[in-house]
Amino acid sequence: MLKFTILGCGSSGGVPRPALGWGVCDPNNPKNRRRRTSFLVERHGTGGVTRVLIDTPPDMREQLLDAKVDRLDGVLFTHEHADHTHGVDDLRAFFIKQRQLVDVYVDAQTGETLRARFGYCFQSPPGSEYPPILREHRLVAGQPVTIAGQGGSITALPIVQAHGDIDSIGFRFGNVGNSCDLGGMPRDSAAALAGLDVWIVDALRERPHPSHFSVSDALAWIERLKPRRAILTNLHSELDYEALRQKLPPNVEPAFDGMTFEVEE
């Protein structure tokens, strides 16, 4: 059994946004308060829990405190953009507690960008008394990654996606797919998402966007791939939770922060 938690389902600015507020979202509905997109996968076993985190947004500290995460066995990154990476320094707490480098999994482009922005996390600068906190592993689309932990192993299949002028990485965990921040998908990637029980998929807003699925884009892909259940994520302040929920098909629903579900393998 795998447990999945949507730690954050908001777009790059979250909801509400400083100076810009709630957009069309009803501030009285707690499901409209959205932190930046992140996702947690857990396997519970007799020896404990294995936890894999997807992305380190600026809200990561609060997300992990709310989810009571006290140990991480690995972090998978979807891409280099700030709303998915700029909380990375807060992984330091896990380095301190676990007394070992935190294993992070990145494609070549994301690894290069993280080292340029947060090089001290990978190698101590000259004269610094602070040790590095991260150990880098390379993600290659189509090559599964297995992360071991106290609860057993979690395997993720990286899937390449188009995201404007860069590629991003989606992941498949058994029969659960996570596809945030994408505007298109190669044929081989679509094939890798066949037969899903649950698909968590980008649906930024109603209007088209050059590097994200709109709601109609997401629904068209859901109809094509036919997962049993679909959850829309990366939601902009232009999408009110309840208004969106009411017009979606029965097997499709909006995400909300803290949403959890379990899937048999």
Where are these regions (language model features)?
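Binuclear metal-dependent hydrolase catalytic cores
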Residues: 1-179, 188, 245-264
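Binuclear metal-ion centers of metallo-dependent hydrolases, dominated by the metallo-beta-lactamase
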Residues: 142, 186-265
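Catalytic metal-binding/acid-base residues of hydrolase active sites
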Residues: 59, 81, 183, 204, ...
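Thr-Gly-centered strand-to-loop micro-motif
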Residues: 158-159, 179-181, 201, 232-233
